[in-house]
């Protein structure tokens, strides 16, 4: 019998977000294989996330410049802290980080109290691959929300339900 791989809720070291060119399907990969699978739904500014332990999350707008990761409850959120979208606050029940854009294009840093604890870097021409290196364990939710903001910033800045169809009003 093959043992089932245990899901790690926090990651440390080298990982990559990878997608084929012009694809809405992404994977977060690490040394042990696929950590999460994501699918962008551009028409609604959301992303669906499947974790190896069977849980499913939805990343959805919750106000101008705010994105939340929702499963059976809100797991984490990321909020824009600067007008240009170069600084974001990533938070959850047990963590809080700052995601800041570096002066070098396509380079971002995760910080705690101003101290860098992780780096995220896109390739020279696109974000179809986003390399991640963390010095300390960072929750998967924080990395996935960071990916959502870095790879698709206009979706992160969208207002809730801008493109989602609303249910028809009930007749009285």
Positions of predicted regions on the chain:
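Intrinsically disordered, low-complexity proline/glycine-rich segments
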Residues: 1-172
């Amino acid at each position: 019998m093959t043992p089932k791989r245990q899901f790690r809720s926090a990651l440390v070291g080298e990982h990559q977000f990878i997608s084929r060119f012009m694809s809405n399907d992404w994977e977060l990969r690490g040394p042990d294989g696929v950590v999460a699978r994501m699918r962008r739904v551009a028409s609604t500014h959301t992303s669906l996330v499947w974790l190896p332990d069977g849980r499913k999350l939805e990343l959805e707008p919750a106000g101008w410049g705010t994105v939340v990761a929702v499963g059976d409850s809100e797991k984490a959120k990321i909020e824009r802290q600067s007008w240009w979208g170069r600084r974001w606050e990533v938070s959850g029940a047990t963590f809080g980080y700052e995601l800041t854009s570096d002066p070098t294009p396509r380079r971002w840093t995760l910080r705690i109290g101003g101290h860098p604890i992780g780096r995220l870097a896109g390739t020279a021409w696109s974000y179809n691959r986003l390399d991640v290196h963390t010095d300390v364990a960072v929750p998967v939710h924080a990395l996935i929300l960071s990916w959502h903001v870095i790879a698709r910033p206009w979706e992160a800045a969208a207002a809730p339900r801008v493109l989602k169809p609303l249910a028809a009003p009930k007749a009285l």
